[in-house]
């Protein structure tokens, strides 16, 4: 990942069609407002199909009934998925009750999906409810601007309820970074909130008239927890504290997990260390990284457009020097930091401010009223009495934060009564995660969310059989190679290849600092479980004291570590 063969700063050639679309969109307006009035189709047409992503929505359909509807000569059952902008994942109980009501009354699935980017998604919003949901968010003090497409997406922040003051400072920076890098266009306010058109010309001083070459993801991380998986992100601010107070950030740039099956020009990559900056330079440096990627990112090939590929093409040193020049700063040497894990601390923890925080494990992040487990109703009941806030975590869990001692018993009783606390959940299940995939994701190649629960049960059985039932392996399943489930930072990562078939990756670590290598390609569940059974058996008997499964697979030579992904990811 050093400057081996620096390439051109700008890639010349025919621009990808997405660049035309953005240029002609009139700063993201397109004809969305007119399309909303078209009752002949349940979807958005032409360029609007992609433009709505800048407004936080993806057009989807129910893939379980797609073929049936085609036979009936009907268009797919179009519905939108909406993703809220929620930097740092903090939401008030009052806001929660508003989104809970909408999910129940105005979506096809009646669920709220907590995502591993610390926000929530609604699935199954019919076209007639699209404008009302944006207006509801507006009334709640929320929005969905820039949670998808070629912009800086929802900014993550480590969920650290214990060190309350440090977390609050880091969270404030996550919010500031999010606001600073937002699109300036008034399109969102005009289309969804009916704000009047202003007779001034739109300008995008940071993102530019054609926005970024590709999506861009940012985190604020508080060591020793790497719950946000910084190496999956383009730009990362690692908090450096002195006496419990935030003093600055280490900057790491160029992480990303998305690949394309069989395309060896694509690869997962860890972020590179750029250096340390004091707090006062944070926004200038964030802007400089984004504008450098804006100007140098590949706009001719979207498969090669992310920051990680720009870094590899121009060289880390060249990119870093440009950021220094644009921000008017010089990076100081990286300050020491260490990650020890990335899972959430499930259950009650007490903060240094004497407030209590309850982390609820939500399998797959899916809040729905299941038979005998009315999870969604339970969270709403807690919201009705809770005086603190809710925090959505990057592990798809929910923290009831800021609970005084006097309210603890009441909130725990509500959580238990609604199935939100289950003492029988294993540590393995708590450390397993999947993306949404079927039936709503149009990119899904294999099951993920619906596959995970039963698959984890089988893995639990393997662990128990080998006498390591109290241990865990970071396990992630993603339904396609785009990386949403962050399987390419797991100790065991399954990447969907086709229905019922996955690529099996091994060799990540618990801290999330190593890319796992593909071990077996295109295998089914039975074959995957056979491989896991054999390897867990070896791990249980051959491991050193405290050695994690991923570290063992590297040391034992089961897989070679990915050292320089641009060169050896596919070896």
UniProtKB/Swiss-Prot annotation:
GO biological process: one example: cysteine biosynthetic process
Alphabetical list of SUPFAM superfamilies matching this protein: Nitrite and sulphite reductase 4Fe-4S domain-like, Nitrite/Sulfite reductase N-terminal domain-like
Catalytic activity: hydrogen sulfide + 3 NADP(+) + 3 H2O = sulfite + 3 NADPH + 4 H(+)
Entry-linked PROSITE patterns: NIR_SIR
Cellular component terms per the entry's GO annotation: sulfite reductase complex (NADPH)
Cofactor requirements of the protein: siroheme; [4Fe-4S] cluster
Enzyme Commission number(s) from the entry: 1.8.1.2
Annotated residues for binding of [4Fe-4S] cluster: 435, 441, 480, 484
Biological or metabolic pathway of the protein: Sulfur metabolism; hydrogen sulfide biosynthesis; hydrogen sulfide from sulfite (NADPH route): step 1/1
Cofactor binding note: Binds 1 siroheme per subunit. Binds 1 [4Fe-4S] cluster per subunit.
Keyword Protein biosynthesis (UniProt): no
Enzyme class: oxidoreductase
Keywords for this protein: 4Fe-4S, Amino-acid biosynthesis, Cysteine biosynthesis, Heme, Iron, Iron-sulfur, Metal-binding, NADP, Oxidoreductase
Organism domain of life: Bacteria
Keyword Ion transport: no
InterPro entries named in the record: CysI, NiRdtase/SiRdtase_haem-b_fer, Nit/Sulf_reduc_fer-like_dom_sf, NO2/SO3_Rdtase_4Fe4S_dom, NO2/SO3_Rdtase_4Fe4S_prot, NO2/SO3_Rdtase_4Fe4S_sf, NO2/SO3_Rdtase_FeS/sirohaem_BS
GO molecular function terms noted in the UniProt entry: 4 iron, 4 sulfur cluster binding; heme binding; metal ion binding; NADP binding; sulfite reductase (ferredoxin) activity; sulfite reductase (NADPH) activity
Subunit structure as annotated in this protein's UniProt entry: Alpha(8)-beta(8). The alpha component is a flavoprotein, the beta component is a hemoprotein.
Function: Component of the sulfite reductase complex that catalyzes the 6-electron reduction of sulfite to sulfide. This is one of several activities required for the biosynthesis of L-cysteine from sulfate.
UniProt similarity note: Belongs to the nitrite and sulfite reductase 4Fe-4S domain family.
Name of the molecule in the record: Sulfite reductase [NADPH] hemoprotein beta-component
Source organism (scientific name): Serratia proteamaculans (strain 568)
Lineage: Bacteria, Pseudomonadati, Pseudomonadota, Gammaproteobacteria, Enterobacterales
Gene that this sequence comes from: cysI
């Amino acid at each position: 990942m050093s400057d081996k063969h620096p390439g051109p700063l700008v890639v010349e050639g025919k621009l990808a069609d997405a660049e035309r679309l953005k240029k002609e969109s009139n700063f993201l307006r397109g004809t969305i407002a007119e399309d909303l009035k078209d009752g002949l189709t349940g979807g958005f047409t032409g360029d609007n199909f992609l433009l709505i992503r800048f407004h936080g929505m993806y057009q989807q359909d129910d893939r379980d009934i797609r073929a049936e509807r085609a036979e009936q000569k009907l268009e797919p059952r179009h519905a939108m998925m909406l993703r809220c902008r929620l930097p740092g994942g903090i939401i008030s109980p009052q806001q929660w009750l508003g989104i809970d009501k909408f999910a129940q009354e105005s979506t096809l699935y009646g669920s709220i999906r907590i995502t591993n980017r610390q926000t929530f998604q609604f699935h199954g919003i019919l076209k007639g409810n699209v404008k009302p949901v944006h207006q509801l968010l507006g009334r709640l003090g929320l929005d969905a601007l820039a949670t998808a497409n070629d912009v800086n997406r929802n900014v993550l922040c480590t969920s650290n309820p214990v060190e309350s003051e440090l977390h609050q400072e880091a969270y404030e920076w996550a919010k500031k970074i999010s606001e600073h890098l937002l699109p300036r266009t008034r399109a969102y306010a005009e289309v969804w909130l009916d704000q009047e058109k202003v007779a001034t010309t739109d300008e995008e001083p940071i993102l530019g008239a054609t926005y970024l070459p590709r999506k861009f993801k940012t985190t604020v991380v508080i060591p020793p927890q790497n719950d946000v998986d910084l190496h999956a992100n383009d730009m990362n601010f690692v908090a450096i504290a002195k006496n419990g107070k935030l003093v600055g950030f280490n900057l790491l740039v160029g992480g990303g997990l998305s690949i394309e099956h069989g395309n060896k020009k694509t690869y997962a990559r860890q972020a590179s260390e750029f250096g340390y900056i004091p707090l006062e330079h944070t926004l200038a440096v964030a802007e400089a990284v984004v504008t450098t990627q804006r100007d140098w990112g590949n706009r001719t090939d979207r498969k090669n457009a992310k920051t990680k590929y720009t870094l590899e093409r121009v060289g880390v040193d060249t990119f870093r020097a440009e950021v220094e020049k644009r921000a008017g700063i010089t990076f100081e040497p990286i300050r020491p930091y260490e990650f020890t894990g990335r899972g959430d601390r499930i259950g009650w923890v007490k903060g240094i401010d004497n407030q209590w925080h309850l982390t609820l494990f939500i399998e797959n992040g899916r809040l729905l009223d299941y038979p005998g487990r009315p999870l969604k109703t339970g969270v709403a009941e807690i919201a009705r009495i809770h005086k603190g806030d809710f925090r959505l975590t990057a592990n798809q869990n929910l923290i009831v934060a800021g609970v005084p001692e006097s309210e603890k018993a009441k909130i725990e009783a509500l959580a238990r009564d609604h199935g939100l606390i289950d003492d029988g959940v294993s540590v393995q299940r708590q450390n397993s995660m999947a993306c949404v995939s079927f039936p709503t994701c149009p990119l899904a190649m294999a099951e993920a969310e619906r596959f995970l629960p039963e698959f984890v049960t089988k893995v639990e059985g393997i662990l128990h059989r080998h006498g390591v039932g109290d241990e865990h392996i970071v396990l992630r399943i993603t339904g396609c190679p785009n990386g949403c489930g962050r399987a390419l930072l797991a100790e065991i990562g399954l990447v969907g290849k086709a229905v019922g078939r996955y690529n099996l990756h091994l060799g990540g670590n618990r801290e999330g600092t190593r890319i796992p290598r593909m071990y077996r390609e295109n295998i089914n569940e039975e074959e995957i479980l056979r491989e896991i059974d054999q390897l867990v058996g070896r791990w249980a008997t051959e491991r050193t004291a405290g050695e994690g499964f991923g570290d063992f697979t590297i040391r034992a030579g089961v897989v070679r570590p990915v050292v320089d992904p641009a060169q050896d990811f596919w070896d």
